[in-house]
Design a protein with these regions (language model features):
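N-terminus-centered regions that define maturation/targeting leaders and the start
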Residues: 2-169
Length: 169
């Protein structure tokens, strides 16, 4: 099944937004290691009718240095988010996640959100929302690559919200 990739500018069907920052704009420090390190509020709309679940991956493709990126750092992995869910509230705890939502392991080797904390320069943070044609089995806290492998062939649409952050000093 082919996946349609959308960006904020295209006036797409599936949309992910945050009331805390605009697409390609700065992420407020409260959502970073320099602040409270809590997850930003996220909202989505126009989920395809055939979707059975949603997945969210937040990562930084500019690690460790945007001038010479060597890896993508994973900040948050969620899957089996119910399609009826309109989004995630600011600073959401694991217990408050929508019923059925499962967490994966980020690159700090733990579940949950880990905010931006770039060592060098201004980094991009990609909030990628996937509409899936299935509800995935319990993957036992997968890393991003394991989740992506399980999603193959089941992605109906994808939306992306990009935020940026650079530490001061």
């Amino acid at each position: 099944m082919a996946c349609k990739k959308h960006t904020q500018e295209e006036g797409m069907a599936i949309i992910i937004t945050s009331s805390a920052f605009f697409h390609n704009e700065n992420i407020p420090s409260v959502y970073t290691c320099d602040g409270r390190d809590i997850s930003p509020p996220l909202a989505w709309q126009n989920i395809p009718p055939a979707a059975k679940s949603l997945a969210l991956i937040v990562d930084d493709p500019d690690a460790p240095d945007p001038a010479a990126p060597k890896m993508t750092w994973v900040h948050w992995v969620l899957y089996n988010i119910p399609v009826e869910s309109p989004g995630l509230e600011e600073g959401i705890s694991p217990a408050a996640l929508p019923d059925g939502t499962m967490e994966g392991i980020n690159d700090w080797r733990r579940t949950g959100y880990g905010g931006p904390c770039p060592p060098i320069g201004r980094h991009r943070y990609l909030f990628k929302l996937y509409a899936l044609g299935i509800v995935l089995p319990d993957l036992q806290e997968p890393i991003k690559a394991e989740l992506e492998k399980s999603m193959q062939g089941h992605i109906l649409e994808k939306a992306e919200l990009i935020g940026t952050y650079q530490r001061s000093g």
